[in-house]
Amino acid sequence: MRHISIFGTSSDAGKSTLTFVIAKILQRAGIRVAPFKAQNVSNNARVCDDGSEIAIAQSFQAEVLAIPTSYHLNPILLKSGINGQASVIVEGQVISQQDVLEYYRDLDTLKPAVQRCFETLAKMYDCIVAEGAGSPVELNLMDKDLSNIFIAKHYQTKIILVADIEKGGVFASVWGTYNLLPADLRSNVIGVIINKFRGDLSLFDEGIRIIEQAFKIPVLGVLPYMPFNLGFEDNASLQNFVQQPRQKKLKIGVIAYPYMSNYNDFEPLIADDEVLLEFINSPISLEHFDGVILPGSKLVIEDLHWLKTNGLFEQLQQRRKPIFAICGGYEMLFEQLHDPERIENLEPTTATGLGLIDDEIYFAKNKILNKAEYPIFGLNIAGFEMHHGISQKYPLYFQKDNIQGTFIHQVFDHNAFRTQYLRAICAQYQGFDFQLYKTEQINNFIEACRKRLNVKLILEAIQDQ
């Protein structure tokens, strides 16, 4: 059976989403399927079942498929850092801090890791659905394109193009992407999916005719724009979240500092009909928020400095209403933060924190990566840790008066904790089952896509020939 590559004709075309959709449809047809992305660039990551670290997109895709997670799904992960540097995570572990030029110069040394992971999965599953990255036809970078060209050429994958019609220029992007692909890859293209169409789908009937007859590319389906508030991969995805504009019981503000990470911690709050969630990226008053949350951060001291320069730091110190903090945000609550090993900074650095917790944070060289059930806030909460910062007095969580915080991600996924926390702020809060919501949303979304896709053509194309 042939493997599949999902190529976007632009960034944010819907590759991550269509990867889990196609994979789940194949799985339901009795095929053993795994998602894969050779290289991802994201500050949003999760700890796998094997204790390694991969991008949130591949973790979420695996969750949809109900398969175990491991670094094999995403062998190379880049996390942006200070001054153009990035953390290079290979096979689940941080190996270096590099600038972009160094990374591309050393790219050939990373190809064996990509091959090892892909081939390990290929022994375990019938079909790998490999998500591409950005555009597959950046001509100046094609020899360095691990996620698109390298995988498609090396494993002769069948290719599905995904085009975002919402951006405009869909015909140029489809024709240009297809015709700029190397000839041997063009012959592997199954067809194109037109994504994010707004309005009556029949209005694109003529567009289908043009693509199929003039471009000679089969159209596998036209998908309407459908809000899907799960699996946020990056800042672009975050900006697209949709909440129903009905009357809310609670208004929660999340401080969206420049290096904010792990947006997915707030998916349960976005999904909650009783909560209005707002991301704060400017120095506005925090008084009208019932609760304020400090999220994770890739560069904690940098983001702490950002708080200090725009007046939010003083507002948080003086606030008497609830403050909740997660991971990097939790570290900001302490009195002092020390980075002697230059984990996040170019020089050994000490910074003054908010002083709301009576201890200090020291950044250790070895990152803590752990996935478990944690005894925090009077409950056993499933989640994961991913941090360098260490607190001797409060190694997992802190709770006193209006201040609560934890190193543990996914705490708001826990129905009992979320209900307990929000009901303490608003007695009228009822709560809901996020896991049930999530399952229903995923199934409904996949079914809506399946009805509009030429699944038969995809299944025929991946059979061994």
Swiss-Prot record:
<dbReference type="Pfam" id="PF01656">
    <property type="entry name" value="CbiA"/>
</dbReference>
<dbReference type="Pfam" id="PF07685">
    <property type="entry name" value="GATase_3"/>
</dbReference>
<dbReference type="GO" id="GO:0009236">
    <property type="term" value="P:cobalamin biosynthetic process"/>
</dbReference>
<comment type="function">
    <text>Catalyzes amidations at positions B, D, E, and G on adenosylcobyrinic A,C-diamide. NH(2) groups are provided by glutamine, and one molecule of ATP is hydrogenolyzed for each amidation.</text>
</comment>
<dbReference type="InterPro" id="IPR047045">
    <property type="entry name" value="CobQ_N"/>
</dbReference>
<keyword id="KW-0169">Cobalamin biosynthesis</keyword>
<protein>
    <recommendedName>
        <fullName>Cobyric acid synthase</fullName>
    </recommendedName>
</protein>
<dbReference type="GO" id="GO:0015420">
    <property type="term" value="F:ABC-type vitamin B12 transporter activity"/>
</dbReference>
<feature type="active site">
    <location>
        <position position="409"/>
    </location>
</feature>
<dbReference type="InterPro" id="IPR033949">
    <property type="entry name" value="CobQ_GATase1"/>
</dbReference>
<feature type="domain" description="GATase cobBQ-type">
    <location>
        <begin position="249"/>
        <end position="417"/>
    </location>
</feature>
<dbReference type="GO" id="GO:0003824">
    <property type="term" value="F:catalytic activity"/>
</dbReference>
<dbReference type="InterPro" id="IPR011698">
    <property type="entry name" value="GATase_3"/>
</dbReference>
<keyword id="KW-0315">Glutamine amidotransferase</keyword>
<comment type="similarity">
    <text>Belongs to the CobB/CobQ family. CobQ subfamily.</text>
</comment>
<dbReference type="InterPro" id="IPR027417">
    <property type="entry name" value="P-loop_NTPase"/>
</dbReference>
<comment type="pathway">
    <text>Cofactor biosynthesis; adenosylcobalamin biosynthesis.</text>
</comment>
<dbReference type="InterPro" id="IPR002586">
    <property type="entry name" value="CobQ/CobB/MinD/ParA_Nub-bd_dom"/>
</dbReference>
<dbReference type="InterPro" id="IPR029062">
    <property type="entry name" value="Class_I_gatase-like"/>
</dbReference>
<feature type="active site" description="Nucleophile">
    <location>
        <position position="327"/>
    </location>
</feature>
<dbReference type="InterPro" id="IPR004459">
    <property type="entry name" value="CobQ_synth"/>
</dbReference>
